[in-house]
Amino acid sequence: MSKFIFVTGGVVSSVGKGITVASLGNILKSRGLSVSVQKLDPYLNVDPGTMSPYQHGEVFVTQDGAETDLDLGSYERFIDIELTADSTVTSGQVYSEVINKERRGDYLGGTIQVVPHVTQEIKARIQRLADRSKADVVIVEVGGTVGDIEGQPFLEAIRQMRNDTGRDNVLYIHVTLLPYIQSTQELKTKPTQHSVNELRRIGIQPDIIVCRADYPISEGIRDKISLFCDVERKAVIFMPTVSTIYEVPLKLESEGVGDLLVSRLHLNASPSDLSVWRGLVEKIKEPTPTVRIALVGKYVELKDAYYSVRESLCHAAIHNGRDIQIDWVHAEDIEKNGPEEYLKHVQGIIIPGGFGIRGIEGMISAVKYARENGIPYLGLCLGMQVMVIEFARYVLGSDKAHSTEFEPDSPYPVIDLLPEQRGVDSKGGTMRLGNYPCVIQPGTMAGQAYGNNLINERHRHRFEFNNDYRDTLSKAGMLFSGLSPDGKLVEICEVTGHPFMMGSQFHPEFLSRPNRPHPLFREFINAAKKVIRDGEQPSLPLSP
C-alpha cells in the first residue's frame, strides 16, 4: 500500500513547492524507495495546453501525451522518472467528470455537491495514481496558496485522505515564506502562523513546515514557529535560497527531512545515499569557463515559458565543463534591428517551440545568421521549421517558402499540417503529443550524438515538414537524419558542411536530466564551446 505526502503552500505563490516536492522525491529515491508524484491544479482549465505562455509558463508533455504544468518537468528531472497523465489533475478535469457522471445518471438522482461528489472524484484520482504506479510513496502537490477559493475542494479531499487510508499513511507538509522587513532587518513569522491557522481551520495540521527565506534564519525563529504552529521543533525545516536549485535536496537532507519522512510514515528504507547528487552540485559550483548562448523566442519576457530548455542547456553545460550564459533575445527585436546587434557575441543559437506568426521573420533571420557565420544552431519544434524555411528561401532561392500555419496559401509550403490534423477544430489535447519512435541515420550528426539507431522522443505539434520538398532540399545540402519508422515524417534535419546545425521536430528538452544531458543539447554545447567570437581571446599555455 502506498504512503501519501501532501504538500501545500502558504503566504505567497511561487514559494518553491514544486522544487520542494521534487527534492522530497529525490531524497526518498536515494533511500531505495519507489516514488510517484502528482500535481493538483485548482484552475478550471482542463489542462494548460491552450493557456498563454505568459500566464502559465511552459507546457510540459508526459510520455503518454498529457499537457501539464512545468512542475512535472522538475519532478521528472530530480527523481529521474517518467510520469503519465495520472500525475496531473485540474479542477476542469474533475468538474467535467462529475458533470458527465451526473448526466449519465451515475449518481442515481442524488443532489450533486462539492462534498462528497467533487472531493470523492479528487480522491479517486489520487488513489488511481497510487494503484497504477504501485509506488512506495506518492507525493501530491496542491497548487496555489492556502486560502484560495479554487483550492478549497482539494484541501478538503486531502484532509479526508488521512481518515480514508489511516493516520500512519499520510503526512502533511506546508511550505511557507518568511518575509524579510528591510527597515527592522528581521524575518517575520506572523504570515506563516496565519497560514497554518487557515490550514488548521480546514482540518489539516501540518506535520512538517518548510520555511523559505532569502536571509539566514535564527534558531529563535524555529522555536517560535514550533510553539505557535504546534509542530515539533525538528519538523520546522529551514530552506534558504541557494545558488542552484539542485542543491535543495542536500539542504533538506541536512535538516533531517529524510529521517522525518521515514519515521513518520514508518517506511522500510535504506540509508540515504546522495553521493552522486552531491557530486553533481559540487561540479555545478566549480568555477568554469562560460559558454554564451542566444535563446531566440517570442515569450522571452517570461523565462518560465522555456523552463525545460533553460535547464537542458544547464545540464549540457555542466557535462561540458562550462557555466552557461543565456542571452534572452526577442525575435521581434531582430525583426526591427537585425540579428547582428544581438548575436555577434554568442557562441550558439537556439530557437525553441512556439505558435503563431509573431516573431517568425526574426527567427528566420537568426537562422540565416547562424548558417552564414558558422554558429552552432539547435532548433526545437518551431525552431526546426524555421530552419527549413530559411534553407528553402536563401539556399534554394525560393523566397516564397513558408509554413501553412502562417501563410495558408503559400506557393512553396515546406511546412504543412499533419494529415491527421486536417478537419480537427478543437484545440485542446489534439496535437501529436507524447513519445514517438524515431529512426536515426548512421554517420550523421544525429547518429554520432545518440549512438543509437532507434530513439523515442516527446512531441507537441500540428505541423510537419512537407515531404513534397524532401528530394529538392536533400540535393541542396539538407540531410534528413531522423525519420519516423515508416519513413513518412521528418523528425531531425541537419545542414551539411556546417559545424553544428540541427533541428528536431520533437522536444528533447523534456528528456534531459542533470546527470544525463540530452544528446542533442550535449553536442550543441560541445560545438558552441569551441567557437571564439568578437572580443574573446583563447587561453594561452603558461610558459614552463
Swiss-Prot record:
<feature type="binding site">
    <location>
        <begin position="382"/>
        <end position="385"/>
    </location>
    <ligand>
        <name>L-glutamine</name>
    </ligand>
</feature>
<dbReference type="GO" id="GO:0005524">
    <property type="term" value="F:ATP binding"/>
</dbReference>
<dbReference type="Pfam" id="PF00117">
    <property type="entry name" value="GATase"/>
</dbReference>
<dbReference type="Pfam" id="PF06418">
    <property type="entry name" value="CTP_synth_N"/>
</dbReference>
<feature type="binding site">
    <location>
        <position position="224"/>
    </location>
    <ligand>
        <name>CTP</name>
    </ligand>
</feature>
<feature type="binding site">
    <location>
        <position position="405"/>
    </location>
    <ligand>
        <name>L-glutamine</name>
    </ligand>
</feature>
<comment type="similarity">
    <text>Belongs to the CTP synthase family.</text>
</comment>
<dbReference type="InterPro" id="IPR033828">
    <property type="entry name" value="GATase1_CTP_Synthase"/>
</dbReference>
<dbReference type="GO" id="GO:0004359">
    <property type="term" value="F:glutaminase activity"/>
</dbReference>
<dbReference type="InterPro" id="IPR027417">
    <property type="entry name" value="P-loop_NTPase"/>
</dbReference>
<feature type="active site">
    <location>
        <position position="507"/>
    </location>
</feature>
<feature type="binding site">
    <location>
        <position position="354"/>
    </location>
    <ligand>
        <name>L-glutamine</name>
    </ligand>
</feature>
<dbReference type="InterPro" id="IPR017926">
    <property type="entry name" value="GATASE"/>
</dbReference>
<dbReference type="GO" id="GO:0005829">
    <property type="term" value="C:cytosol"/>
</dbReference>
<feature type="binding site">
    <location>
        <begin position="148"/>
        <end position="150"/>
    </location>
    <ligand>
        <name>CTP</name>
    </ligand>
</feature>
<feature type="binding site">
    <location>
        <position position="71"/>
    </location>
    <ligand>
        <name>ATP</name>
    </ligand>
</feature>
<feature type="binding site">
    <location>
        <begin position="14"/>
        <end position="19"/>
    </location>
    <ligand>
        <name>ATP</name>
    </ligand>
</feature>
<feature type="binding site">
    <location>
        <position position="141"/>
    </location>
    <ligand>
        <name>Mg(2+)</name>
    </ligand>
</feature>
<keyword id="KW-0547">Nucleotide-binding</keyword>
<protein>
    <recommendedName>
        <fullName>CTP synthase</fullName>
        <ecNumber>6.3.4.2</ecNumber>
    </recommendedName>
</protein>
<feature type="binding site">
    <location>
        <position position="71"/>
    </location>
    <ligand>
        <name>Mg(2+)</name>
    </ligand>
</feature>
<keyword id="KW-0665">Pyrimidine biosynthesis</keyword>
<feature type="domain" description="Glutamine amidotransferase type-1">
    <location>
        <begin position="299"/>
        <end position="534"/>
    </location>
</feature>
<feature type="region of interest" description="Amidoligase domain">
    <location>
        <begin position="1"/>
        <end position="267"/>
    </location>
</feature>
<keyword id="KW-0460">Magnesium</keyword>
<dbReference type="GO" id="GO:0042802">
    <property type="term" value="F:identical protein binding"/>
</dbReference>
<dbReference type="InterPro" id="IPR029062">
    <property type="entry name" value="Class_I_gatase-like"/>
</dbReference>
<dbReference type="InterPro" id="IPR017456">
    <property type="entry name" value="CTP_synthase_N"/>
</dbReference>
<feature type="active site">
    <location>
        <position position="509"/>
    </location>
</feature>
<dbReference type="GO" id="GO:0046872">
    <property type="term" value="F:metal ion binding"/>
</dbReference>
<feature type="binding site">
    <location>
        <position position="462"/>
    </location>
    <ligand>
        <name>L-glutamine</name>
    </ligand>
</feature>
<comment type="pathway">
    <text>Pyrimidine metabolism; CTP biosynthesis via de novo pathway; CTP from UDP: step 2/2.</text>
</comment>
<comment type="function">
    <text>Catalyzes the ATP-dependent amination of UTP to CTP with either L-glutamine or ammonia as the source of nitrogen. Regulates intracellular CTP levels through interactions with the four ribonucleotide triphosphates.</text>
</comment>
<feature type="binding site">
    <location>
        <position position="54"/>
    </location>
    <ligand>
        <name>L-glutamine</name>
    </ligand>
</feature>
<feature type="binding site">
    <location>
        <position position="13"/>
    </location>
    <ligand>
        <name>CTP</name>
    </ligand>
</feature>
<dbReference type="GO" id="GO:0003883">
    <property type="term" value="F:CTP synthase activity"/>
</dbReference>
<dbReference type="GO" id="GO:0019856">
    <property type="term" value="P:pyrimidine nucleobase biosynthetic process"/>
</dbReference>
<feature type="binding site">
    <location>
        <position position="13"/>
    </location>
    <ligand>
        <name>UTP</name>
    </ligand>
</feature>
<keyword id="KW-0436">Ligase</keyword>
<dbReference type="GO" id="GO:0044210">
    <property type="term" value="P:'de novo' CTP biosynthetic process"/>
</dbReference>
<feature type="active site" description="Nucleophile; for glutamine hydrolysis">
    <location>
        <position position="381"/>
    </location>
</feature>
<feature type="binding site">
    <location>
        <begin position="188"/>
        <end position="193"/>
    </location>
    <ligand>
        <name>CTP</name>
    </ligand>
</feature>
